[in-house]
Amino acid sequence: MKDLVKFLKAQSKSNDDFDVIKIGLASPDKIRSWSFGEVKKPETINYRTFKPERDGLFCARIFGPVKDYECLCGKYKRLKHRGVICEKCGVEVTQTKVRRDRMGHIELACPVAHIWFLKSLPSRIGLILDMPLRDIERVLYFESYVVTEPGMTDLEKNQLLTEEQFLDAEERWGDEFEAKMGAEGIQALLRDMDLEHQCEMMREELQETNSETKRKKITKRLKLLEAFQQSGNKPEWMVMTVLPVLPPDLRPLVPLDGGRFATSDLNDLYRRVINRNNRLKRLLDLVAPDIIVRNEKRMLQESVDALLDNGRRGRAITGSNKRPLKSLADMIKGKQGRFRQNLLGKRVDYSGRSVITVGPYLHLHQCGLPKKMALELFRPFIYSKLESRGIASTIKAAKKMVEREEPIVWDILAEVIREHPILLNRAPTLHRLGIQAFEPILIEGKAIQLHPLVCAAFNADFDGDQMAVHVPLTLEAQLEARALMMSTNNVLSPASGDPIIVPSQDVVLGLYYMTREKVNAKGEGMYFLDPREAEKAYRTGQAELHARVKVRITEHVKNEAGELVAETKLLDTTIGRAILWMIAPKGMPFKVFNQTLGKKAISKLINESYRRLGLKESVILADQIMYTGFAYAARSGASVGIDDMVIPAQKHEIIRAAEAEVAEIQEQFNSGLVTAGERYNKVIDIWAAANERVAKAMMENLSTEEVINREGNPEKQASFNSIFMMADSGARGSAAQIRQLAGMRGLMARPDGSIIETPITANFREGLNVLQYFISTHGARKGLADTALKTANSGYLTRRLVDVAQDLVITEDDCGTHEGIVMTPLIEGGDVKEALRDRVLGRVVAEDVLKPGTEEVLIPRNTLIDEKWCDVIDAESVDVIKVRSVVTCNTDFGVCAKCYGRDLARGHLINQGEAVGVIAAQSIGEPGTQLTMRTFHIGGAASAAAKESSIQVKNAGTIKLTNAKFVTNKEGKIVLTSRNTELTVIDTFGRTKENYKVPYGAVLSKNDGAEVAVGEVVANWDPHTMPVISEVSGRIQFSDIVDGLTVTRQTDELTGLSSIVVQDVGERATAGKDLRPALRLVDAQGNDILIPSTDVAAQYFLPGKAIVTLDDGAEIEVGEALARIPQESVGTKDITGGLPRVADLFEARKPKEPAILAEISGIVSFGKETKGKRRLVITPAEGEAFEEMIPKWRQLNVFEGEMVQRGDVISDGAETPHDILRLRGVHAVTDYIVNEVQEVYRLQGVKINDKHIEVIVRQMLRKAVITNAYDSEFLEGEQVEVSRVKIANRKRAEEGKPLVEFERELLGITKASLATESFISAASFQETTRVLTEAAVAGKRDELRGLKENVIVGRLIPAGTGFAYHQNRAKKRNQPEQAGAFEAPVAKANGFATDADIEAEFEFVADDATQSLAALLNAGDEE
């Protein structure tokens, strides 16, 4: 025991306990201190003896012995000589392991610039010397001199001299000045830098300068100089005089058979450096001519460059096989580099993989493990059991027994496996449910058996998928596997909070079949005592499964006290439903079972069960449902036959009619009445409509059949057609697929997404002819190619998301903020996209919710809204709630539980230590592969939607108009004169039911506050033109409307009416450039009429292309159109859909033609125009007017004299999230990104909780730009973490200083990942070289806060069960004096601890970990 304790003690000491990792530049002395000797020769090993050469790259004297405890010449062998240095060969006798960590060094004959600091942009050496990179390179590669000491001459320091200039200068001044070339020159300049003085100068310059670019440049340089000052790095260390040599076992040389060697590329690169270095030393000793020495120096510089980062400068050095050699930089970067290959992902022992097959008889927490695999995986456990039982005397004997597979071994295996969970994993692991724990059941055969209900989580199917098995070894690991990862503990999806253990396919079909009802089935109208009797009747053939009968049902209902009370009723049901009720757990209502169960209904049922009865019952129910479903699916005998695809009789008639219509359109086109585009669109519309009609006829035909009921009358019932049942239940197939089988295939898309106008009129049952087949392959092949590309893109998006969010963990319970985001139901047009209850479920209320219309508190602040509260919200018809959100959370590092709300996968408030960032990233990334790359415009749907021209109300209620300005015309109708008007319909409870955008110039039949009935049309407008509405009555007076200059006259050939068309500025003659055509309204005397309630004259400027049909001097009434502006057809813009759109949003990319937003609130006017742009002026109520130049071709949404609010959209186009953040703030940008991302996912029918997107948005917003720094540690214009500014501001507030002012900045996820505080995390993500260079120069410290950093240094992550471990370490760090007191008693009088003390200490450590785990596990049960 003593030895063991000593051994443990020694082991635990070796693990240096560190809290921070610092990276910096290595000084030459530092490199020499690491080194165990200088490498002088380029030789590696002797080709005959295979012994390393002395002083060579593998020298045993420098790096350590080749064999354990044995010197090279063999004089000293074995352990007793440990630590002796052999006098003959100079090798220390020790473990050969030291060859992995002992470094050597090379003394360079001349200094060499480090390529990372030279060439990694922006060049650090260039920045600190304030010289362009080109000049530095010319000095380094010996093309020109640089002045290092100007002396009393007219040369400047840092000035470059060519060879001639240098010689001239030397003649003039002799040795008064000093100029050098090569790295010596650069090193001298760096050594002479006075950092403090430079910083002072830069600061002064910053104060004086006004130019933006200069400020930026100075700030950059100042930051670098300050970093050097603070980190203690010296600038001259960026030029190396000593080169470290990697330990030899990290760049091995392996003899192959046949006398050849396989070697690491690094050895080649080192050999080159040493050869050139030695040659240079010799040349310097011989005092060779300058030009030769220079060439050698340049070659040395190049070879060192290649060793550090091959291919960064010039051509990469290649090996014998023409492939570039792998340098030190290549070793760490990229997917195969050190970070991603060996530190973030490791291969593990105790694992195996095999094909999976279905295990329909398993319980949810079990999986079938082949005996062969189990034997191999649990080997050590079996050995120890065999030995401890005394069955085998030694481990060796045990091994023999296992290899012979003796019968006793199988018994022991069964014992070992019992209750030892194993992990199953299916690649690709897109979310955390891709690895789950199961209890193994030993089976014959070689395939793993998987429970069918977990397939959805793994996204597995049994067409040859493989899965990997891992064995958790330690007790803690087994505990975690059982408590956190067991498949029974993962019933709900972390992405949406819905059950993920949901039956699919066969099971659904079986349940659907057994709960259907049939008219006049055998046994209809019978009465049964209980479900058991009903089942008996079915089994004995006295009644059919679908017969409508009456059965006595006993339900268990909760009473006031919350106890279950039995209630028995006689209910109408069917035999199948009664049988299904037998597996229902107590406390479920019968009405959930007493219906035809499709996939949705079953999912609801499991969800209901989980919320009512908890985990255990739900899991048992799911299992029972599965067994029943399989059994009855087999009974149903549903199959697919060709006769099940019934083609509707009306099909030919419908197609004939459509063909006739198309012919007519073609006729019109030939006679020039419609354009080619119109013809194409109309043809597609006709065929799309025909397809719909055929499909409708087909579905009516398939879905119902007429039967004779008991009274002898015909009655319609849902049909028992197999194909229809499969689609209707949601087991397999969809209406769209049946349409292709039995209706018509319809319109096909080309690979670019455009629609081929000839449809395929045949269906698959009739068969396609060659042409039709060819057309359909066209778009289908694109689909297959897309899928392959999609997967890679989706994986990359997930990786970026994980990287940006990885360090977000729940770190405290409540940050105490009162901020939050305001939630309302999502309404688009006439339908509720998402009800309020779905949006606030699982959130915490930020402010008391009042009962509508009263001051009474309905839901107090800080309440977690669960299903019960949702019902209250519905009942009281609340339609706006302020909930807490991750984006507004005040916690410095991490998020608080209250702001996050419910843990979706567990159903209670989230625990501390939960890694919400990673969960969010996985939830968004996992469905990524399902998102189509491009949204195919389904026949004509895209063009139809854009051309709305009226609003028809779907619900009765009251109309409410927002942002509305209008005039009333002579018919008493209202004509809108405002831009972004919204029309909402509100029901009697004050809930918003519908929400529409109404365009300018629309005619409304109802005013604000009017009542409407269902189906009423409340607004009309012309979708093709935009009118200019007169706001007063009067006579028209033309202004600047000159024929031939600003306008042209057109006469319609058919009607003979003439109209005036305004020309674009670009098309006018020079004389007309400055004229601004307008219509003024005057009274009979010719005076301007003022617009009511303003002092602005009524005159309307006409944009280009506007058409005026009225004449000068015509009378016009208020609300009439003065002119019309034709609208380019909207909706032809191809919207990027699917994955690329999501990526664009998270990368915060600026759209090509972003919308222009109003920078301030005020009145719009237009100033003087220039050639291609017009000047937009916004004049606020007080303060400066704001001017902006806008290109002519942009369509503006505002008229002169209109009032705009800050952040309003002025011109069409997509909004930039950066603008939204700047002008409308954090809430608006969160809203924007969340809604836009959800839009994409909703189209695909994927449900993701808003929380996850908010988490990513929080990470995108974690940087701020300092706008006013006062006397703080920040610089103006510097980008800093928001949390750092907040911490600084809290301190300043206590000291009574003014707070640092800052603006939040939105970064795309890639940028945000690279801008993280942790350089380890950033380096392992992308652009490794750049990140490490920057970090080293700045002497950055990594606090190891995130998950990635801790994985890389090999620690427990500060999340989940590792959260407590990190908290304890933090506590100990913050209270060193108490820690000392705690450790004092262990040291006894004699200064040594007893074994018992040490044992106790070790026990404490183990307990600590288990306690924290126990605490975490209990947190889930307290609810």
From Swiss-Prot:
TM ranges: none
Function comment: DNA-dependent RNA polymerase catalyzes the transcription of DNA into RNA using the four ribonucleoside triphosphates as substrates.
Family indicated by similarity: Belongs to the RNA polymerase beta' chain family.
Enzyme class: transferase
Origin organism lineage: Bacteria, Pseudomonadati, Pseudomonadota, Gammaproteobacteria, Pasteurellales
InterPro entries associated with the record: DNA-dir_RpoC_beta_prime, DNA-dir_RpoC_beta_prime_bact, RNA_pol_asu, RNA_pol_N, RNA_pol_Rpb1_1, RNA_pol_Rpb1_3, RNA_pol_Rpb1_3_sf, RNA_pol_Rpb1_4
Keywords: DNA-directed RNA polymerase, Magnesium, Metal-binding, Nucleotidyltransferase, Transcription, Transferase, Zinc
Example GO biological process: DNA-templated transcription
This enzyme's EC code(s): 2.7.7.6
Amino-acid positions noted as binding Zn(2+) 1 in the UniProt annotation, renumbered to this chain: 71, 73, 86, 89
UniProt: Mg(2+) binding residues: 461, 463, 465
HAMAP family: RNApol_bact_RpoC
Binding site for Zn(2+) 2: 815, 889, 896, 899
Protein name per Swiss-Prot or TrEMBL: DNA-directed RNA polymerase subunit beta'
Cofactors demanded by this protein: Mg(2+); Zn(2+)
Subunit architecture: The RNAP catalytic core consists of 2 alpha, 1 beta, 1 beta' and 1 omega subunit. When a sigma factor is associated with the core the holoenzyme is formed, which can initiate transcription.
SMART domains in UniProt: RPOLA_N
Cofactor note: Binds 1 Mg(2+) ion per subunit.
